[in-house]
Swiss-Prot record:
The gene is NDUFA5. The keyword Transit peptide does not apply. Accessory subunit of the mitochondrial membrane respiratory chain NADH dehydrogenase (Complex I), that is believed not to be involved in catalysis. Complex I functions in the transfer of electrons from NADH to the respiratory chain. The immediate electron acceptor for the enzyme is believed to be ubiquinone. It is a peripheral membrane protein. The modification N-acetylalanine is found at A2. One of its GO terms (biological process) is respiratory electron transport chain. It is found in: Mitochondrion inner membrane. GO terms for cellular component: mitochondrial inner membrane; respiratory chain complex I. This is NADH dehydrogenase [ubiquinone] 1 alpha subcomplex subunit 5. Its main location: mitochondrion. The modification N6-succinyllysine is found at K98. Keywords: Acetylation, Electron transport, Membrane, Mitochondrion, Mitochondrion inner membrane, Respiratory chain, Transport. Belongs to the complex I NDUFA5 subunit family. The modification N6-acetyllysine is found at K30, K46, K60, K98.
Length: 116
């Protein structure tokens, strides 16, 4: 990358990232590391791992910022970085919550019935 292409994101509170490719590579790698600690059969791991690997491959393959933004379809790369940070936080919480384990007690029979 030949340097910063813009001076502002135009979004209040969201600063320009000077090294978006590096930042995204780090975040996606951290997400994948956390997902490794979740059982392979857990739906969250399966789908998040697939999406994260696809995005990481795009980041590694496309050096042009604008083209990468178009491929990722998540707005500006700074917005994609913010999304990746949120996904990393969620992955850590999912690991902590152990949502793949069975419920402590059975839900009420009509819990999902509507109208009651």
């Amino acid at each position: 990358m030949a340097g910063v292409l813009k001076k502002t994101t135009g979004l209040v509170g969201l600063a320009v990232c000077n090294t978006p490719h590096e930042r995204l590579r780090i975040l996606y790698t951290k997400i994948l590391d956390v997902l490794e600690e979740i059982p392979k059969n857990a739906a969250y791991r399966k789908y998040t791992e697939q999406i994260t690997n696809e995005k990481l491959a795009m980041v590694k393959a496309e050096p042009d910022v604008k083209k990468l933004e178009d491929q990722l379809q998540g707005g500006q790369l700074e917005e994609v970085i913010l999304q990746a940070e949120h996904e990393l936080n969620l992955a850590r919480k999912m690991k902590e919550w152990k949502l793949w384990e069975p419920l402590v007690e059975e839900p009420p029979a009509d819990q999902w019935k509507w109208p009651i």
